[in-house]
Amino acid sequence: MAQQAADHVALGIAATDARDLRTAVQHFEAALAQDSMNYEANWRAALTLGLMGDPYPMSAKSPERDSLYARAERYARRAVAANPAGADGHFALAASLGRAALMKPTQEKLRSAKLIRSEALRAIAINPRHDGAYHILGRWNAEIMRLSALSRFFAKNFLGAKVFNQASWNNAIFYMEKAVQLDPGRIYHHLALADIYADRKRLRDAGAQLRLVDSLPVREAMDTNYKQQAASLQKRLAKR
């Protein structure tokens, strides 16, 4: 049974590399049907389901997207339970919580933020070269700074989340630049960094990142989508 689970995980990884997310998650879930606490199958299923939900517009309600994100969180929590010392499980949980939080009202988003940050930090403590966890921390800082001053005041004073005092644009840039440094071939890092630079009116730096997005080869399932987002951002920046 363990070998059957391992075979399905290997097939899921191959499907991921082929950018076939639906087939990948089928194999990861087949592995979990054999061994529900298989650490790698759980965290990989969580990340794959999250990616499958990403194309749905954030501005519209989507039960399908919400279901994908809920399944992702469930698998990520199980991965952490199966192997608390594994960086990828903590990263998958931070990513799953982060995706779900983006769909929620501000107050609910803030309630999730502390755990998202702590899970990403835990992943980095275990693996200091985890580019995905640095990406989440960069995004975390940026999303907190994008909130209104009133929302941040509410978080600090009524939710008891003093951790929000540590959020800054400088941290957002530092962590996202670190993600780019660790994996310069990952398109998503460059797109997110361009977005942060644009927020800080560093338009030349943003443009440089967007040109990299355009020039880099498609490597992952969502890369074509990210290239489209980058082209859209480039058009908006050209009007400034």
Write out the residue ranges for each language-model feature.
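Extreme N-terminal leader/anchor segments
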Residues: 1-40, 48, 203-217, 231-240
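Short coil/linker segments at helix-helix boundaries
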Residues: 11-26, 48-85, 92-129, 139-178, ...
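Amphipathic alpha-helical segments within well-ordered protein domains
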Residues: 29, 77, 121, 194-195, ...
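Terminal, low-structured helical/coil segments at or just beyond the last alpha-helical repeat
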Residues: 150-160, 183-187, 207-240
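Glycine/small-residue-rich hydrophobic helix-like segments
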Residues: 170-212
